[in-house]
Amino acid sequence: MDKTDQTAIDGSALELNRTEKTVEAVLRVASMALSITGLVIMIKNSISNDFGSLSYSNLGAFMYLVGANGVCAAYSLLSALAILALPCPISKVQVRTLFLLDQVVTYVVLAAGAVSAETVYLAYYGNIPITWSSACDSYGIFCHKALISVVFTFVVSLLYMLLSLISSYRLFSRFEAP
């Protein structure tokens, strides 16, 4: 058992080495950048043609996607700064808080991606049994941009799954059970 593990089990604090902090901060900054990219693509996504105008704000799923990406970007920035600025050793409460917030952000972003993916799917393929036709025949570029934004959101979701694994490993392997 190395010194880091002994510190965590013997007391209520955990030493994070520079590499751990750097990797986690890079993952969080990457999540922030991808969230902002997905958010900006969706916000700028609007089209107007003979069939009418369409914007992300016309669809609740896309409004939720924008909100979730905004929350994720803000949390990613704040948590990256917190990880780098936290004094060593960090307390059990801080580790638990990061774990909990990472879980919440993971599920919020995953839900936003899933509901938006369903909306994009319906826009591309419609629903023939209830006579919904494809909207992408009329609003092609809107659908393509929405799909790109959803892909960015799922990549963010994957990064947050990785961050959740890191924070859960840190919490459950280095601290005694409550």
UniProtKB/Swiss-Prot annotation:
Record keywords: Cell membrane, Membrane, Transmembrane, Transmembrane helix
Record membrane topology: Multi-pass membrane protein
Cytoplasmic side: 1-22, 91-96, 167-178
Subcellular localization, as worded in the UniProt entry: Cell membrane
Principal location class: membrane
Transmembrane regions listed in the UniProt entry: 23-43, 70-90, 97-117, 146-166
Extracellular-side segments: 44-69, 118-145
One BP annotation, GO: floral organ abscission
Domain of life: Eukaryota
CC terms in the record's Gene Ontology section: plasma membrane
PANTHER family referenced in this protein's UniProt entry, alphabetically: CASP-LIKE PROTEIN 2A1, CASP-LIKE PROTEIN 4A4
Entry similarity comment: Belongs to the Casparian strip membrane proteins (CASP) family.
Subunit relationships: Homodimer and heterodimers.
NCBIfam families xrefs: A_tha_TIGR01569
Protein known as: CASP-like protein 2A2
Organism: Arabidopsis lyrata subsp. lyrata (Lyre-leaved rock-cress)
